[in-house]
């Protein structure tokens, strides 16, 4: 009974944490960073990068529009895209990929400018973790990431997606990709697998590190700053309960390594061909 009470307290902390630190005065701001351009094997032009939430409120509907120009200064096209995450917490960065899918236009691009639009949104519950991530390269030179997403929320997680932002040696973004867990719905206190691929050696060979973020209709990834607080809260609650039940000879274990999950996986990969 007491153990269930502790677990309930921890779950409530996770749910209300986004609201505990809401600022008194809202600052709505964001910036584009770490962008690079490339032309893929199909002849399509891309600009990939991140949008960093530099304000103190959540953002949504984050749209990046590009103005493409030829060498003579004439305008070619106005492609646009949204970040792969629908909701962005303060201090977080979300990847984007703006693509020009007309080969003739792509070949004529000499310069570009980017415009950023966004709106304030309400906080989203932190409840999802990507973990046990394994990286391999297939026979085509593609990077293949496999792992699991854990649902630590208070209800099922629908339309669960994993967003990968991949960086080169200079720290700039070289690829952004997205996949869904299989299946996309994760029941309460359960996990589902995912697989995310960086296709082809032309992009994969540039990758030196990456980050993974998870989002669903109900939840988003547990951020790094919150994880230590959760662990501290769990440890404190367990210590109190352990003291109270010590007279009857019962103790409660500390959280396992599996429970100490973090939002972001950001490593230098070491690949083994499959």
Regions found by a protein language model. Give the residues of each.
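Secretory targeting signatures
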Residues: 1-28, 220-274
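Short, solvent-exposed loop/turn segments enriched in Ser/Thr/Gly
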Residues: 42-48, 141-146
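Short acidic/proline- and small/hydrophobic-mixed sequence motifs that coincide with surface turns
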Residues: 58-61, 76, 109, 156-159, ...
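Hydrophobic beta-strand segments
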Residues: 63-66, 81, 161-164, 179
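Short aromatic-acidic-glycine turn motif
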Residues: 68-78, 165-177
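Intrinsically disordered, low-complexity Pro/Gly/Ser/Thr-rich segments with frequent PxxP/GP/PP motifs
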Residues: 76-105, 174-203
